A protein has these predicted regions:
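A short acidic, amphipathic alpha-helical/loop segment
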Residues: 136-144, 166-171, 261
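Conserved phosphate-binding/catalytic loop of the ribokinase/pfkB sugar-kinase fold
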Residues: 78-80, 88-127, 132
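Conserved phosphate-binding/catalytic region of the ribokinase-like
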Residues: 193-310
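Glycine-rich phosphate/adenosyl-contacting loop at the front of the ribokinase-like
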Residues: 1-51, 62-65, 300-310
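Gly/Ala-rich phosphate-binding loop of Rossmann-like dinucleotide-binding domains
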Residues: 44, 146, 254
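Conserved phosphate/ATP/ADP-binding segment of small-molecule kinases
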Residues: 146-151, 157-226, 234
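A glycine-rich helix N-cap at a beta->alpha junction
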Residues: 68-83
């Protein structure tokens, strides 16, 4: 929602102890989101048929149909009988200040999901990406992956601020991939009390997104890989860019291409998303994707990717 005035003008200095405000907004945009769904949507666009695991509300039917149409397996989404799907509601004023609320809703039921059931249904799991979710659910799914020997990626992002050091240590220890941005990278080290080197010794690969500078992939005793982003045609909305990178990167892993190539696919998809308002509003046209990918990363890289896009 957009408020044409300034929030600051609506507050009375000596009445801040009893605030009661209502804003007449100009427009209402309802957009699909959620980190898991955003990543799955992107992977579906790339043809990898990801399995979305999470908890949604009894209002999920329309969203499920959308994801199904875009190549996402939604059969393992738990549906709450009593709660709505989690959502973020935000109003932005003329100065781009925001007032927002996040409703967790059915997300709290993610802790009730057992990954073994999912694995049995599909004949095994190659990699489980554990993203920002119900904290108890994240811990349960991490422990289940560890106990069952299922490779997993740790990607706590927005939940880092809420979790304590011990919880974060549990979530990342033994991960095949650890995802974060630069700020989160430092916060992880501060909260866990582990140095960068100590964390690298506990995970397979540390994947750090660097904004417009691309991504860095590190591994203990191995070569550091840095990949830049393709040039943007325009910058419309940064929301969901990190999810798009993960979608491209994870798709590359599913294809079996080298890490550098997977990161390039992630950066290309992230660039398409930043050029579009909304996290799932972009269309991946294969010819256009490959044309820009080739321009950014060269013919050899493009040949390795083209065969997987069809």
């Amino acid at each position: 929602m957009t408020f044409p005035g300034r929030f600051a003008d609506q507050f009375v200095a000596d009445q801040l102890h009893t605030v009661s405000l209502s804003f007449l907004v100009d427009n209402l945009d309802v957009r699909r989101g959620g980190v898991g769904a955003n990543i799955a949507f992107g992977m579906g666009q790339l043809g990898t048929r990801p399995i979305l695991v999470g908890a949604a509300g009894f209002d999920f039917d329309e969203y499920r149909a959308w994801l199904d149409r875009h190549g996402v397996d939604t059969e393992s989404v738990r549906i709450s009988d009593t709660l709505h799907t989690a959502r973020f509601v935000c109003t932005t004023d003329a100065d781009h200040n925001q007032i927002g609320s996040f409703y967790t809703g059915a997300m709290s039921e993610a802790r009730l999901i057992e990954l073994k059931t999912v694995a049995d249904r599909v004949g095994g799991l190659d990699l489980v990406s554990i993203g920002a979710d119900d904290p108890e659910g994240m811990l349960r799914h991490t422990e289940e992956c560890r106990s069952r020997g299922i490779p997993f990626a740790a990607d706590f992002s927005q939940q880092i601020a809420r979790m304590n050091g011990e919880e974060i240590r549990i979530l990342l220890d033994g991960a095949t991939y650890l995802f974060s941005n630069e700020y989160e990278k430092g916060l992880i080290e501060t909260k866990t009390g582990w140095s960068d080197a100590e964390i690298l010794g506990r995970v397979g690969h540390r994947v750090t997104t660097l904004g417009a500078r691309g991504v860095r992939i590190e591994q203990a005793g191995g070569e550091t890989i840095e990949v830049g982003c393709p040039d943007e045609e325009r910058k419309a909305d940064p929301t969901g860019v990190g999810d798009a990178f993960r979608a491209g990167f994870l798709s590359g892993l599913a294809w079996g291409v080298p890490l550098e190539r997977a990161a390039q696919v992630g950066c290309m998809l992230a660039t398409l998303v930043i050029e579009t308002v909304g996290t799932q509003e972009y269309q991946l046209r294969r010819g256009h994707f490959m044309e820009r990918f080739t321009k950014a990363y060269g013919d050899e890289a493009a040949e390795e990717v083209r065969e997987h896009l069809g």
